[in-house]
């Protein structure tokens, strides 16, 4: 395997040389013997900031590939007492050894095991699950391996089922009914969190989002793991419901499982999806700490993008409602000229943009008020 040295953040690692694995002039990271995707640098950059605030004693990266994520945590975030890196690919495990040594890390434990098998053997304060595709196969084992009040982090790149494009796949993987709706970018994240909560409950545990976001082609979630059947039951009863959208007028709301399914505005039957998580997507105290801290990481290649994301999330996080997609709402209302988002925000007064969609707004004001602004500004 021919290697190439790359720099990401403050570390230098060896990765398979992309030139050796091109097909007809194109390269996909999955074609190489060991997976390394430079397009996920933004994900790793933000994760470095999160881990720097958590300062876990033990960090476990269960699907390490080149080891880049765990190595960056140790070098840039926090020199944990123990760094555990694992990959079931023996070629990857050997490359991790090289990269750990190349970055002067002496206390790393490197495993060449199936991720689930390893997770049922050891416990950790921070566990990272960054798979190629869905994290579902690793939910039970990773939540089980996370100590009380520890953190588990998931990346999900299978947006097709989560956003409703592949309904049968969503039912199979996430045990949720799904359709492609106006706010599916956010609803997909909520379906993912809902699935994790239900899986954790079988272990008499539960999870609460610490920080989460959508970017490019994936969701990223950092969640606090709590123990206790009562806490698991409380979270399910309070924060797992369904979501309804009216296909005629665009009205949307969270609904109970056995509620009436007709739109209160126009009487059309709702399109119902779920179950999904309806609670806050971020811990506000932790979000404030992130905003107060991220400037310390101005060396990151995606620093400006991180700044923009956090600025938007800070504003939208206070609203409880799912965002409205103004472009799609205007289409349902037969409004040909979509008003500028900034004008709608000014009209509403108490509202914000959302990081989920450029034409989305988030507000706790009623549907009628949103419609009034959209129509008055056309």
Swiss-Prot record:
Give the highest taxon in the source lineage: Archaea
**Gene3D superfamilies from the xrefs?**
N2,N2-dimethylguanosine tRNA methyltransferase, C-terminal domain, Vaccinia Virus protein VP39
Biological process (GO) annotations held by this record are: tRNA N2-guanine methylation
Q: Which InterPro entries match?
A: SAM-dependent_MTases_sf, Trm1, TRM1_arc_bac, tRNA_met_Trm1_C
Q: Where is the Trm1 methyltransferase domain?
A: 4-374
- The enzyme class is transferase
EC no. given is: 2.1.1.216
Listed A to Z, the keywords are: Metal-binding, Methyltransferase, RNA-binding, S-adenosyl-L-methionine, Transferase, tRNA processing, tRNA-binding, Zinc
UniProt binding sites for Zn(2+): 246, 249, 263, 266
Disulfide pairs here are: none
| Catalysed conversion reaction | guanosine(26) in tRNA + 2 S-adenosyl-L-methionine = N(2)-dimethylguanosine(26) in tRNA + 2 S-adenosyl-L-homocysteine + 2 H(+)
Spell out the SUPFAM superfamilies in the cross-references: S-adenosyl-L-methionine-dependent methyltransferases
The terms under GO molecular function for this entry are:
tRNA (guanine(26)-N2)-dimethyltransferase activity; tRNA binding
Specify which residues bind S-adenosyl-L-methionine according to the UniProt entry for this protein: 44, 69, 87, 114-115
Q: List the HAMAP family hit by this protein, alphabetically.
A: tRNA_dimethyltr_TRM1
The UniProt entry's sequence similarity note says: Belongs to the class I-like SAM-binding methyltransferase superfamily. Trm1 family.
Q: What does this protein do?
A: Dimethylates a single guanine residue at position 26 of a number of tRNAs using S-adenosyl-L-methionine as donor of the methyl groups.
Quote the NCBIfam families the UniProt record gives.
Answer: PRK04338.1-7 (NF003331), TRM1 (TIGR00308)
The name this protein goes by in its record: tRNA (guanine(26)-N(2))-dimethyltransferase
Instruction: Give the organism, scientific name.
Output: Saccharolobus islandicus (strain Y.G.57.14 / Yellowstone #1)
